[in-house]
Amino acid sequence: MARVQRKAALRISSAYRTVSYAAVMVITGVIPIDIKVQERTAVFNKQVTKAEAREVSIGKWQMRWSKEVKGAWTRRLLPNIKPWVLRRYGEINHFVTQALSGHGCFGNYLKRIGKQDTTTCWYCNEKDTPEHTLFRCNRWTRHRIKAENQVGKELGVDNLIETMLENETSWDSVSEMITKIMKTKVEDERQRQKA
């Protein structure tokens, strides 16, 4: 069942198939199937209310996520899943998923999967990681500054998700920044492959 659920979550998030089950479930906000079955069973047997069962499920999921070995970058951005899972707005897309999973146009990922020989950033010769791309690379300063001006604070690993969850405007600003950066990187990667 978990395999089927993972496939569905990969489709929902437009994630690459290399993203771990644990990470893609958090990114999509879909409770893992085994925990969901326990939740539904408890409600069906009238042991708890739906709200109580959901609270227990999120607690179990959080404990599992905190101990998870895979999805380290996602866990760094999203250490606490409850606010993310319970949000009332904000959709993810392929580019946001790349940024949240670390599986996308990043030198460290492309080298790991054998698509390039180095982890070096194409724009500044630093090691290209999701953190570098989103928060440090000078190539994306304009997009970062625009988003930071809109949300009223400097963005970093420790506050990216918190900022997105503040309100719809912040979500849209950060999501737009991520999408523009990642979309440009994907287009640049295609051009590099043609050369």
Residue ranges and their predicted role:
Residues L10-R17:
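Charged/polar positions within long, soluble alpha-helices
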Residues S13, T49, G59, K82, ...:
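Residues marking helix boundaries in flexible regions
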